[in-house]
Structure formats: C-alpha cells, structure tokens
C-alpha cells in the first residue's frame, strides 16, 4: 500500500500527573472506539500546529506542552475526510502531553464533534483499561501495554512502531 494514500495525522498522549490518560470515544455504525485526541494534519500545518489545533478542538486544552513522540502508528482502513479526499488509512505520530487534569471543554460545538463521531471524553487509569469489559475497543488495541512501559520505564528513546489493518 502506497504511503501517498495514507493520511498524515497526530495524536496526543494526554496524561495527568497520576498517569491517567485522556481519551475520546468515537462512535461509528460498526462500533465504538476509545482513542487519543488528535486527527489529520492540514496541508499548511506542521505536526505541532496540527496537534495544538486538534487538542483545542477536541478537548479545549490550550498551550499544551508537547513532548517527545512516543509511538508511530500506521492504520489501514478506508477513509474520506471532510474535504472529500479518499485515503487508504493514516499514519499517526503520537506525542506525550503532560498536564494537570482538566475538564474537557472542546472549542468545537456538539454538532461539530458529532460530525467527527466524537461522543465522549474520559480520563482512564491503566488499571481501568485493563479491567474494562465493555463492548468498545481501545485504539491501538494494546494501548495498555504501551502505557505500562511508558509509566514504568519512561518515554522510549525510539518511538514504538505500530502497524494495524482493519
């Protein structure tokens, strides 16, 4: 699969000082997913500009201190973005974002959030992720194992590489 058909994206591993992770719940006809906040990089943006914009739109987090990349993820699936561009998946770079816990107050309206399939925010502990028995999926599926390494060993010197096909 050509990387020319993969949408570039960024996400934030937004963690409070107790190692809880802020995730957003995306709901689709085929199921719901807990994912890290973020999204596609606009043509005129670099990674940092895109991540600041996405965090503001989806969570209301302003002037976030963005740290090192913690993983890169390639996800193969069919996607049509808001501009009508068709993609065969996306490549995501996930950056560490340490912050005080806050109550999400997205800059996007409820209507704009729903248009992006975003329905909920939640701070998750690693223990809650591991104990979760609901129908929703975490993305990436094994996020808890990556978080365990980050919490116990620190940010990796070289970002994890994650590949997934739907």
Each model region followed by its residue ranges:
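Short, charged/polar surface micro-motifs in flexible loops or helix N-caps
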Residues: 15-20, 29-30, 42-43, 72-77, ...
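Nudix hydrolase/Nudix homology domain
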Residues: 31-34, 101-166
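A short coil-to-beta-strand element that immediately follows conserved catalytic motifs
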Residues: 62-72
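Conserved Nudix-box catalytic region and its N-terminal flanking loop in Nudix hydrolases
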Residues: 20-61
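Active-site-adjacent beta-strand/loop module that shapes the phosphate/pyrophosphate-binding cleft
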Residues: 75-108, 122
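Short Gly/Pro-enriched turn/cap motifs at secondary-structure boundaries
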Residues: 2-4, 84-86, 113
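Short connector loops at helix/strand junctions that flank enzyme active sites
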Residues: 7, 29, 36, 48, ...
């Amino acid at each position: 699969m050509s990387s020319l058909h993969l949408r570039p994206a960024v996400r934030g591993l937004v963690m409070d000082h107790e190692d809880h992770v802020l995730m957003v719940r995306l709901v689709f006809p085929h199921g719901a997913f807990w994912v890290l906040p973020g999204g596609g990089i606009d043509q005129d943006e670099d990674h940092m500009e895109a991540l600041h914009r996405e965090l503001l739109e989806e969570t209301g987090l302003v002037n976030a201190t963005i740290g090192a990349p913690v993983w890169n993820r390639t996800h193969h699936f069919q996607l049509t973005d808001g501009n009508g561009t068709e993609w065969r998946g996306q490549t995501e770079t996930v950056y560490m974002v340490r912050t005080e816990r806050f109550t999400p107050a997205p800059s996007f309206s409820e209507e704009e959030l729903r248009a992006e399939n975003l329905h909920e925010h939640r701070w998750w502990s690693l223990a809650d992720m591991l104990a979760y028995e609901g129908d929703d999926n975490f993305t990436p599926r094994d996020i808890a194992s990556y978080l365990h390494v980050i919490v116990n060993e620190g940010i990796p010197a070289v970002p994890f590489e994650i590949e997934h096909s739907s």
